[in-house]
Amino acid sequence: MKTSLKIKTYVSSNVGWSRISYKSAFLWIKGYFYNTNPKRILVALFEKQNNLSEIKKILNTINGHYGLIYQNKNIAIISVDKISSIPIYYLHDKNKKIFYVYSNSLNSSKKTGLKKINGILTSVFSMSGYTIGSETILSGVKLLEPGKFIYQKDNKLRIESFFLYEPWNIIIDEKPRLKIELQKTILRNIGNLINSVNNRPIVIPLSGGIDSRLIASVVRFLGYKNVYCFSYGSKNNFESKVSESIAKKLNFKWFFVEHTIANQKNFFTSSLVSDYEQYADNFSSVPYHQDLFSINYLKKKKLIPANSVIVNGNSGDFISGNHLPSAFLQKMDYQKTDSERLEEILNFYIEKHYSLWKDLKSNKSINDIKRKLIDSLKTVNYRFDHPENSHGIYEFLEFRDRQCKYVVNGQRIYEFLGYDWRLPLWNNDFIDFFENIPLRFKLNQNLYRETILDNDWGGVWRKIPINKSVVKPYSINLLRNLLKPLFFFSKKKWGEFDKRYLAYWYHARRVYASKSYQDIIKEKRGFRNPVSFSTERYLNRRGLDHSGKIVAQP
């Protein structure tokens, strides 16, 4: 992309951005760093600002999560990190020959008057909860993708990559050596985390699964004790009991935040949620709500210190292979042509990630999404020519669109409530390690799980259940067990019945409480999960229906 125009930036220091200068250059920056600091980054960019390959090296070696805007006379460098954890947007106004850059939520950029909705993209958004590639639902506005930066020199502007997630470029190696390397990577990452918080309290949303337990156990193994853990959900839910057992074994403070249908219903209609959604809106995904109620509760009750650093387990499960469709990938037919296999992969991916509403799925809508996904892959030199890299395209698409836009954007919760955050399982060396390991070591997270269980950090892995769930209250569990045999010949129909009539009462986080039970059981459009309703609510606020179309005015 080359053009001749001026860059105009909108940056606000009240949302965590700070400005520093060096000679004639200045740098707006937000984030945290393990191996450098803002001043060193500024000086390095100043010294290499005319050398594109050197700029790429500088950005690629920054270990941390950040957004930055560098300007010096006729040169500008605007970059996000490898997961776009702090989003930056841009808009090319061809009439005025201005290239606008926004570092804050576009809701706060009132000067630009950005209101026009991209109707084509909202149809994609309505089926997944996020957009494809650099697109947002605002016409003309783009999101700077993971690992990319804008480079302007002498009014010539281009968008470049310093990093591309390429899980199809596998490196064949043996499991014993990889397990040793993963052990070192984990210890190094958590050690960097501890050093970066400068003795401040670490607060961990601790589940009964792997990722947050890994962080908590290794933090303890490395001797850091200023740690608070919490869990949430319905009273006496099994996962919270596991969380409590882990925290007790590690000798960390632990809190429980109860979710009831009543308090969650009030939560979703509160000003807290509407204000947060305004703050966190990236116009490329539905806002992520998961920790908002609980962190706000802990803050109001003064159960965690004001200078706490929140550290969650995103997205260890994804990067280690837990989201890969094992059975599908292992059956991949390599006698078929590349185009036939690509078609199969995209069909499976769309079925998994673009199915929020059954009534929106049609041959036309699926083909439209498929075309957009294929178009977005045209600049990527992907490969799937070997059984060990057949997962590459599937994993890349989820990384770029779901993980980096939706899941990672959950860090806005902590910023909104006034806390710093860290994402140790998205650090450079963690990404680098898992990006290129063969499929056989990612399936069912076998390498990740085995390495962790072998080390048993903190003594919380072999005797405390992992990812086990028990449906409560027991009355609902009994009812489910009585009803399930009636659907013996159709597992799919049982799943639909269970979701529509029973999940409202037993889901531990009470995630369906944004709707009334009557609305749930009357729902005829075929919702997939609670994100279906979150996405509909997001679109409704913009005058759109659940399909992304403008609601007709009476």
Kindly give the residue locations of the regions a language model identified.
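Short, glycine-/Ser/Thr-/acidic-enriched flexible segments
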Residues: 106, 315-317, 431
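Cysteine-centered catalytic environments shared across enzyme families
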Residues: 1-206, 210-262
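Glycine- and acidic
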Residues: 167-177, 200-202, 227-231, 276-281, ...
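Active-site adenylate/phosphate-handling loop in enzymes that bind or generate adenylated species
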Residues: 295-366, 418-426
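A conserved donor-nucleotide-binding helix/loop in the catalytic core
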Residues: 286-303, 396-398, 407-409
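Generic recognition of stable, solvent-exposed alpha-helical segments in well-folded globular domains
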Residues: 145, 177, 181, 185, ...
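Adenosyl-5′-phosphate
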Residues: 1-9, 13-14, 141, 305, ...
